[in-house]
Amino acid sequence: MVQLGKLLRVLTLMKFPCCVLEVLLCVLAAAARGQEMYAPHSIRIEGDVTLGGLFPVHAKGPSGVPCGDIKRENGIHRLEAMLYALDQINSDPNLLPNVTLGARILDTCSRDTYALEQSLTFVQALIQKDTSDVRCTNGEPPVFVKPEKVVGVIGASGSSVSIMVANILRLFQIPQISYASTAPELSDDRRYDFFSRVVPPDSFQAQAMVDIVKALGWNYVSTLASEGSYGEKGVESFTQISKEAGGLCIAQSVRIPQERKDRTIDFDRIIKQLLDTPNSRAVVIFANDEDIKQILAAAKRADQVGHFLWVGSDSWGSKINPLHQHEDIAEGAITIQPKRATVEGFDAYFTSRTLENNRRNVWFAEYWEENFNCKLTISGSKKEDTDRKCTGQERIGKDSNYEQEGKVQFVIDAVYAMAHALHHMNKDLCADYRGVCPEMEQAGGKKLLKYIRHVNFNGSAGTPVMFNKNGDAPGRYDIFQYQTTNTTNPGYRLIGQWTDELQLNIEDMQWGKGVREIPSSVCTLPCKPGQRKKTQKGTPCCWTCEPCDGYQYQFDEMTCQHCPYDQRPNENRTGCQNIPIIKLEWHSPWAVIPVFLAMLGIIATIFVMATFIRYNDTPIVRASGRELSYVLLTGIFLCYIITFLMIAKPDVAVCSFRRVFLGLGMCISYAALLTKTNRIYRIFEQGKKSVTAPRLISPTSQLAITSSLISVQLLGVFIWFGVDPPNIIIDYDEHKTMNPEQARGVLKCDITDLQIICSLGYSILLMVTCTVYAIKTRGVPENFNEAKPIGFTMYTTCIVWLAFIPIFFGTAQSAEKLYIQTTTLTISMNLSASVALGMLYMPKVYIIIFHPELNVQKRKRSFKAVVTAATMSSRLSHKPSDRPNGEAKTELCENVDPNSPAAKKKYVSYNNLVI
């Protein structure tokens, strides 16, 4: 019979003429009759309209034998569900009234080739021709029972079986509705146009499984598939959807071969292969019951309890049988199953079945023996010997365990879908006819298929039963997790559902040993905050983590970006934050010293100025040149004041005052000193040439010259104001160190180092010029005592500013630039002012206060005395002296008496002329 089926399948697919098929019917009839003599192989129920049924009543047989042991749940439960549905429909006056549904139910033995041979029974009536002229080899006409016409088929179960059967049913336009086949390829309406199913395809299931895996944070999984259409196509769909979704990688795809010599060794090898990628703990399984059981057993033998995270397809569902004796290795397994509900009416129906009231089921006696582990004395077919005999009084659910099989609901829905289609077809074609009218009998499968695709009713679970254009049912799944710890009822727990989108109650989930924390199945642990992923070529789920360095932050998982100019990375480098703004604070050590010196200087300056004002008409004050002394003291005071402006918090007003007073104090001081030294120099130079007094040596002239020199500084400042108005800035370059944590923005006036030097440059020029005059007047006699202190002042000041320049510019790249430069500048100005104050005025103040007896006018100087001193000084400069240290020079000066009659003879007296 097997070889006949294969031959007929080939001939049918090759579209041989019907006459050839007619000849083969003789052989088919004889073979069918012979098989009926061997054992009953189908269920026949008479009716006005006959539906075919394909169920895996038996498992695959060993090599050479088509069928094996009976399958109690997947086989008998589902078969009885069809019988139950037929009873309900035939007793329903509102569904197919006056029409009785019959059935021809066959066993597929869980094998696609055997199912194909069995399904030829459904097409016999369609290829039946006039056989009056047909003779068998012995000359006799063929003898066979006229087959009933099957208008539609319920089944099959396995996807590979449905694919094989669908190929032949479509040739004869027989609609087919499956209750369990989920292979995605069956959605191809061009190849399987007469195929429909009340369960969603694996493409929906695969999408749901991808959503589950991603919801749990897993991105590195392995797949395991039973060889065949269901397993391989399911994994193919899962892989394709995961690629489209992104963020999910397949570590390895393992296929379980169908033909195995040693099951134990093969499954142990599979577990070892899965362990080659230890980070891929999640295993997505599309496998049959037996393969699931064997893989769990192999994992237990490998002592991998708790390692693998199983994600099972609907072939696993909520079944208990595959987990028997392997509950510990299966704990935490997540399984998916088309949304279903227990059909209570079926439970009552099935538990009431006995050998007496269920004779229509030709396999029920065999089920009875298997279910109650007994042996029937007459019609039993149980192979193994047993001492216990079946009494026939056993009861299902009472004397044996019973739990409704998961696909019972879908079998019932499939039968009802066919019934509703026939009902609408009957109403349209047989409106005025009771029963099946000729039009309906001749309508054909294509018309029935149209009605099937348009059915819409509430199924046994209360959910709508409908089909899309490809014949697929909507995707509705329940999601379970197998839990044995921390529960009073170990078993499958409903943790979510999927209907186009995932709803998962993660808080209800637990894993091995009752752990609530979701285990990981990732190639590489997520990068820490502030690190970016650098993916490995070919494995986007595997990466190395590279820290964002410098002023970079983690922009996204793959990218580090630089923070804006005025920001730095936050602590974990996940974003940017503003760089702290700093300025020189009053309490800073860098500010305390300059402020202290400035305050001392200001006090001293005020004291000197007050003393000079108090003793304004005394000889020492008058001899110092009162007008320029007050100007010089004002400049010294401003040199001290600039310290406070340099440390004050920058704003527009402070910055404006900085520009004005930065060089003004020094300019006033050195302008006054320059005027003094220039006056001394001109007087003595003029004295060498003539007895006529030089011009512009009066106090008014001296003030005018000093004011002119100062006005140049002020003019430059006003031009600076016009070209570049004062403003405040935040300088981020100054303190932008290699370590962003130490980065600071410096709040300061918009004054560059070059502008500072330019502002001080004019004052430095005055200082240098004054120093030159101090050098030139170094030979002035001691009686003209203003020149020497000025000279010492200028020498010291030059040393101070020569030290200032390298310090100021040498710290341009230092992190402490703000502090060092400000402190250096203010201290330099304080020292310059202090040197001038100390050398020029402190000795005079000391005499005024502590030795007032010396503050008297000794003699009046006339310009004649100055000329005489200048002449003698000139002579001495050209005549070598035998006395060291200028003693001769002093002696000569002392011998000159400007009050002698000779001196007064030719010259006018300059009693009020002060040097």
From Swiss-Prot:
Q: Which residues lie on this side of the membrane: Extracellular?
A: 35-590, 649-654, 724-753, 811-825
SUPFAM superfamilies in UniProt: Periplasmic binding protein-like I
Compositionally biased region (Basic and acidic residues): 879-892
Provide GO CC annotations from the record: asymmetric synapse; axon; axon terminus; cell cortex; cell surface; dendrite; dendritic shaft; GABA-ergic synapse
Q: What segment(s) does the record annotate as region Disordered?
A: 874-895
| InterPro entries for the chain | ANF_lig-bd_rcpt, GPCR_3, GPCR_3_9-Cys_dom, GPCR_3_9-Cys_sf, GPCR_3_C, GPCR_3_CS, GPCR_3_mGluR7, GPCR_3_mtglu_rcpt
Q: Which domain of life is it from?
A: Eukaryota
Q: Name one GO molecular function term.
A: voltage-gated calcium channel activity
Subcellular location, record wording: Cell membrane
Q: Could you tell me which residue ranges are on the Cytoplasmic side of the membrane?
A: 616-627, 676-702, 776-788, 851-915
**Family under the similarity heading:** Belongs to the G-protein coupled receptor 3 family.
Query: What's this protein's function?
Result: G-protein coupled receptor activated by glutamate that regulates axon outgrowth through the MAPK-cAMP-PKA signaling pathway during neuronal development. Ligand binding causes a conformation change that triggers signaling via guanine nucleotide-binding proteins (G proteins) and modulates the activity of downstream effectors, such as adenylate cyclase that it inhibits.
Q: What is this protein called?
A: Metabotropic glutamate receptor 7
Q: Which organism is it from?
A: Rattus norvegicus (Rat)
The gene name reads: Grm7
